[in-house]
Amino acid sequence: MKWFNTLSHNRWLEQETDRIFDFGKNSVVPTGFGWLGNKGQIKEEMGTHLWITARMLHVYSVAAAMGRPGAYSLVDHGIKAMNGALRDKKYGGWYACVNDEGVVDASKQGYQHFFALLGAASAVTTGHPEARKLLDYTIEIIEKYFWSEEEQMCLESWDEAFSKTEEYRGGNANMHAVEAFLIVYDVTHDKKWLDRAIRVASVIIHDVARNNHYRVNEHFDTQWNPLPDYNKDNPAHRFRAFGGTPGHWIEWGRLMLHIHAALEARCEQPPAWLLEDAKGLFNATVRDAWAPDGADGIVYTVDWEGKPVVRERVRWPIVEAMGTAYALYTVTGDRQYETWYQTWWEYCIKYLMDYENGSWWQELDADNKVTTKVWDGKQDIYHLLHCLVIPRIPLAPGMAPAVAAGLLDINAK
């Protein structure tokens, strides 16, 4: 049974994409885009986070490129928010979180700033007159504070004044840096961003994870030595969970295939390890995380022996798994990846997609019942595009540039 690159399946993906776009519109608040609850309501107590606002700027840049009326206004709102309350006019960069009364968290987080970079780069594809200026400023901040020339890797975080950096290096922030760097490369054509993406992937995946059965280390010291026991006493941490986070493993796999495709588009021979490691990451996720306790779903975390730690099934890992399945099929032609893609869609239809309240449930327990152990509410819609739009575009250029270039469904029949 064939789904990939068929017009009939892509039409279904498009319908679901529009449903998700409509749900996300509820997140508009004066300071940016807010945290959505399970019924699409704003959770005012959560404040306005940079990472959500920047991701929604990216999302509606894609929607604008798809020709969705109203999306450009949301891009405009996102750019104004990035230049408004979230932006630190004194020290530069962006606060982690604000609300209507002022700054909630003044720290400068790499994870969040890399989404600012993604959002700004995606906005450039809409032709918004302020987008390139925002991107140039964001690049300046990234170059100055978050890219280490000495380490040739990304730093994790700073205090408000950019005077003290954290004695910690994070795989999650560096992964999203790779994602953003690829889009910056697409819109600027400056190859250093592609080179940086390759460098980061080579360290975290090819040098470390490959030698750890593709169980990706998330936490490192300042010398890039893994910290395997980090947060062992707080295993369900939203951003720094203990052990391995299989959703990140498989997400890394897709990013490496985007690098692979970007090199091919330059008529350069990609290193063989990009594809080999992408396969390894996919296989490790299936091996350790898919239904390890008898119930379907991808568990949130595992230990270093591959045993489940946090058994909740969070939404984004399986979404990323479907995007990576498509990417691997595109590169290899191996039908097993389409079979997994179909299996995972059946799971999502059965358990995750919420047609009554909108969007998808963010988290299920080990019995696939809705819960809030790790996440509360439905936050944003960013990850969902990775199973709804990625299967409709080439692997290079990246999402917003590809859609803006008219490449949506270019291979569909």
Swiss-Prot record:
Q: Which HAMAP family match?
A: SQ_isomerase
This one is known as Sulfoquinovose isomerase
Q: An example of a Gene Ontology BP annotation on this entry?
A: 6-sulfoquinovose(1-) catabolic process to glycerone phosphate and 3-sulfolactaldehyde
Activity regulation info:
Significantly inhibited by Cu(2+), Fe(3+) and Co(2+). Partially inhibited by Mg(2+), Ca(2+) and Mn(2+). Also inhibited by ATP, ADP, dATP, TTP and GTP.
> What happens after mutating residue 176 to A?
Loss of activity
Give the pH dependence: Optimum pH is 7.
**What does altering residue 320 to A do?**
Loss of activity
| Catalytic activity line of the entry | 6-sulfo-beta-D-quinovose = 6-deoxy-6-sulfo-D-fructose; 6-sulfo-beta-D-quinovose = 6-sulfo-D-rhamnose
Q: Which residues form the active site?
A: 248 (proton donor/acceptor), 383 (proton donor/acceptor)
Q: Which family does it belong to?
A: Belongs to the N-acylglucosamine 2-epimerase family.
Q: Which InterPro entries match?
A: 6-hairpin_glycosidase_sf (IPR008928), 6hp_glycosidase-like_sf (IPR012341), AGE/CE (IPR010819), AGE_dom (IPR034116), SQ_isomerase (IPR030875)
Q: Which UniProt keywords apply?
A: Carbohydrate metabolism, Isomerase
CDD domains, alphabetized: AGE
GO molecular function annotations of the record: identical protein binding; mannose isomerase activity; sulfoquinovose isomerase activity
Q: What induces it?
A: Induced during growth with sulfoquinovose.
Q: Which residues bind 6-sulfo-beta-D-quinovose?
A: 55, 111, 172, 176, 238, 251, 362, 379, 383
UniProt signal peptide? none
| Gene that encodes it | yihS
Pfam families the UniProt entry points to: GlcNAc_2-epim
Subunit structure, as described in the record: Homohexamer.
What's the stated role of this polypeptide? Catalyzes the isomerization of sulfoquinovose (SQ) to 6-deoxy-6-sulfo-D-fructose (SF). Can also catalyze the interconversion of SQ and sulforhamnose (SR). Has a clear preference for beta-SQ and little-to-no activity on alpha-SQ. In vitro, can also catalyze the interconversion of mannose, fructose and glucose, or lyxose and xylulose, but has extremely low activity with glucose.
Q: What's the Enzyme Commission number for this chain?
A: 5.3.1.31
Q: What happens when the gene is disrupted?
A: Mutant fails to grow on sulfoquinovose as a sole carbon source.
- Relate the outcome reported for changing residue 383 to A: Loss of activity
